[in-house]
Amino acid sequence: MIPVTEFRQFSEQQPAFRVLKPWWDVFTDYLSVAMLMIGVFGCTLQVMQDKIICLPKRVQPAQNHSSVPNVSQAVISTTPLPPPKPSPTNPATVEMKGLKTDLDLQQYSFINQMCYERALHWYAKYFPYLVLIHTLVFMLCSNFWFKFPGSSSKIEHFISILGKCFDSPWTTRALSEVSGEDSEEKDNRKNNMNRSGTIQSGPEGNLVRSQSLKSIPEKFVVDKSAAGALDKKEGEQAKALFEKVKKFRLHVEEGDILYAMYVRQTVLKVIKFLIIIAYNSALVSKVQFTVDCNVDIQDMTGYKNFSCNHTMAHLFSKLSFCYLCFVSIYGLTCLYTLYWLFYRSLREYSFEYVRQETGIDDIPDVKNDFAFMLHMIDQYDPLYSKRFAVFLSEVSENKLKQLNLNNEWTPDKLRQKLQTNAHNRLELPLIMLSGLPDTVFEITELQSLKLEIIKNVMIPATIAQLDNLQELCLHQCSVKIHSAALSFLKENLKVLSVKFDDMRELPPWMYGLRNLEELYLVGSLSHDISKNVTLESLRDLKSLKILSIKSNVSKIPQAVVDVSSHLQKMCVHNDGTKLVMLNNLKKMTNLTELELVHCDLERIPHAVFSLLSLQELDLKENNLKSIEEIVSFQHLRKLTVLKLWYNSIAYIPEHIKKLTSLERLFFSHNKVEVLPSHLFLCNKIRYLDLSYNDIRFIPPEIGVLQSLQYFSITCNKVESLPDELYFCKKLKTLKIGKNSLSVLSPKIGNLLFLSYLDIKGNHFEVLPPELGDCRALKRAGLVVEDALFETLPSDVREQMKAD
């Protein structure tokens, strides 16, 4: 016997592939085994038993009326007559005799073989081999897509990912998270489902729905305690699965080789079925038990007509009918498969029912080979697709990232990052994380939260636990916010800083923060660069006092006018873009501080002169060359701080004397060569910065500034200091470094409050010992060359070094 197991390799496949074998493939596999057994059984009989048994035919000669036989008739006789036998001597004894052919065993074997080859129909001879070959072809066709490299690699990869997704603890955890959603989200989902149900009156929607999914409405009942027991390792494994599913989906959805190959192998099986049915039905009658054999072998055997018995004809006839039945069932199954392939839209797969049953609304529909494999899996078990769908959801992925983030950033680890910011608030900076850890909201002492380069941030309702939170910084973050969290921020948030690159990073909910006092915006608002990024109305920001815009606008945004009545400080940092239209400034009547930095201004804007409440004006890093308009500042009675630094101003007009209320004047980094004596008629000046200019002489009228506390002429060309400078008894900081001074007057000892002195970079040879009279001056506050410091008396040096 030939063992059937020898043919296993033709249909052998990995056990995991069974998930891609629908019921019809399993059924045809069993039919193939049955047909294979028929073929093997027939072949075994062919090999082990006699194929045919033949006997010569006796042909009687034609009879004549004459007593003498005709010689020619005797010769023509087909079969020679045996020689006459003598009659028995005893007539009473009867001997049984058969027909004798005088043929030996070798001749019989020769006759059998010749008649088998010449007389027996080819179908009767090769029937079992045909059955065996056809069955093997069927088996090869059924499993070819599992063996072909272009398709088997995708199948193996898919099944590997599918098994891991099915067994992953995150699947249960994700469904648990969905079942615990906020009531608000559930209500929204119900409303959406009701609306969609109203629109679709019939049972069929636009998307293809899997029949198996409709027939098995699975209800997920999740144990919360078990779902919460996802450790860090399992979280990392689930995260890796999400990445694998993403890459696999992109790869498989590009083509349809699996679908095309499955269709082709099914079509091939149908064609083969039709051929088998056609020729077997026509030839099955050729299998006969008795076969007449006429072969010209009379010279070797003495006979040429034989009557043969095909020993297996009866069995082969029954096997052939049985085989035809199996093939018919096989073919009908293949025809049903073709109907399923062409009637159903297998290149698209909708998770509509999964979305409804699980509540995960963002599971995407898939197409091409990815969709085809999911349809095949549904024929095996729809639960695989449902659990696999969890790893296609961005919501599920974000929740996993959130869980991993919470495990990584514990409250103790976050508290180690706390620091005090420029506003003297306790701040937590978080940079380039995958999300916002929920553990942040356990740090109740937090006053400022700074998020940088974090995508898809969701601010939950638990932010209400941060009772002390007043400041929020969002730098290149796309932020969504829960309605309860928004209500909390409307009541508590005082400072908001937003740095954005596109519209998604400019939160739309910021326009409703009614208690917001400070708003800092950094990003492009230019129509040439980002046409969609515009400021909406700020009229709801009733408490806004400070507005800072660092952008490249050509005019003051119209939205700023909405808060002009209560805005106190306005800052525009324009990154070199020319600020042309400033008429909106006139409407900001309550403005006390104005900064127009790097706006490419060539003149002081006339709109500034209308701001009667203005106290501080900063025109840093512009292109100012002349400030003749400064005379109009006399109308600004409250102006105390004027910053004209980092410009190209060559001289200071005498009209500056009319700014009698001026207390702080910044003129550094300009091209001023001459200091007008009228400058010092502003006798309220406490801070005067003239560093980095081309000044050579300081007028003695500087002694009039009795309130002067800070004076800097660093990096000029001054050769001597007037003695009147030392009349400024309140001077605390004196910076005269990098000049051409050669002598430091002993009168410096009159500056009893001097605590910082910079004289480095001059031509001093010795320091006056009167520096010791400056009791507030210590070694750390004295910027001087070490060698020059050693020229002081030892007691003075010791005094300065002492704490």
Curated annotation (Swiss-Prot):
Q: Which residue ranges traverse the bilayer? A: 23-48, 125-144, 263-284, 315-339
The reaction(s) annotated as catalysed by this protein in its Swiss-Prot or TrEMBL entry are: chloride(in) = chloride(out); iodide(out) = iodide(in); taurine(out) = taurine(in); 2',3'-cGAMP(out) = 2',3'-cGAMP(in)
Which of the residues are on side Extracellular?
Answer: 49-124, 285-314
Please give, as recorded in its UniProt entry, the membrane topology of this protein: Multi-pass membrane protein
Q: Determine if ATP-binding is one of this entry's keywords.
A: no
Q: What induces or represses expression of this protein, per its UniProt record?
A: Induced during the earliest stages of adipogenesis.
- Bias (Polar residues) ranges: 191-206
Segments annotated as LRR repeats? 409-420, 421-443, 446-466, 467-488, 490-513, 515-537, 541-563, 566-586, 588-611, 613-635, 637-659, 660-682, 684-705, 706-728, 730-751, 752-774, 776-799
The tissues in which it is expressed are: Expressed at very low levels in adipose tissue.
Disulfide-bonded cysteines: 54-308, 115-293
What subunit structure does UniProt give? Heterohexamer; oligomerizes with other LRRC8 proteins (LRRC8A, LRRC8B, LRRC8D and/or LRRC8E) to form a heterohexamer. Homoheptamer; inactive, likely because it is not targeted to the plasma membrane in the absence of LRRC8A. In vivo, the subunit composition may depend primarily on expression levels, and heterooligomeric channels containing various proportions of the different LRRC8 proteins may coexist.
Protein family membership: Belongs to the LRRC8 family.
Protein name stated in the entry: Volume-regulated anion channel subunit LRRC8C
- List the gene name: Lrrc8c
